[in-house]
Amino acid sequence: MLQPPNILTIAGSDSGGGAGIQADLKTMTAMGAFGMSVITALTAQNGLGVTGIHAPGPEFAALQLRTVLDGFPVHGAKTGMLFNAGIIHALADILDAETFPLVVDPVCVSTSGHQLMEDDGIAALRDRLFPRADLLTPNRPEAEAFTGVAIKTDDDAIEAGTRLLDMGVKAVLMKGGHVEGKPVFVTDWLLEKGHEPVALRQPHVDTQNSHGTGCTLSAAIATQLGFGLPLRIAVTKAQEFLNLALRHSYAPGKGFGPVNHMAGLKK
């Protein structure tokens, strides 16, 4: 049997288990990879929201990353919640020397509206990690925050994605999940330097149990890149994984439930 790829998540911990590193590791495992983690923040949260955040110092975040890299080859990685500029700079100093595929999910605000990044982290993320990113996966509010473009149409999404490419990222997946009403399809736009934008559509799933969707998608893409797939195919497979997880999502407790990462493993 071929050995599975080693995939790394650099993100915050969700005590409720639906998002963050918990969602990432479930995704990697369900896809047949070996998941590893660098924890950038501890969050106290559940399906109702975030009640507190505790972040380790930048030195300990960097120590986790160096220790993982010293012990394991990494075939793909993603970043999620990074919380502040100090952590971002400490991690970027190490990541700049690495060549594995890196998916950057620019997490700024939780689904419940809680700020997950301090104000100084926005510029640090843009300046230090965007140039290292093989793919950036912003949702609409995140893309608007980084570009200043009010996204209401597909043309707006493409304009915002183009501006993000100009900031140094190699490719951008403009996620279309933040839409009003009940559309038949959700359209994500994949933009790569030197290529025309590509519309990637998936059936819309009408559910309130969507906690951890962004984390799951970026982890799934990083995993597929770790298997050696080309970017567009990796994104498509990740979308399919997330869509299935959404269709089988449920609420194990109060509030918004998580997607079901194990849906594809059921018999």
Protein language model regions, located:
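Short, small-residue alpha-helix embedded
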Residues: 27, 144-145, 207-231
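Charged C-terminal helix
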Residues: 4, 55, 71, 232-267
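Glycine-rich beta-alpha junction loops
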Residues: 42-43, 83, 108-110, 142, ...
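Phosphate-handling active-site elements
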Residues: 31-36, 196-197, 224-238
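Short pre-catalytic strand/loop immediately N-terminal to key active-site residues, enriched for Gly-Thr
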Residues: 10-16, 197-211
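Conserved phosphate/ATP/ADP-binding segment of small-molecule kinases
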Residues: 119-197
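Acidic-glycine-rich active-site phosphate/pyrophosphate-binding loop
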Residues: 1-4, 9, 20, 184-200
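Conserved N-terminal subdomain of the carbohydrate kinase-like
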Residues: 2-9, 21, 25-116
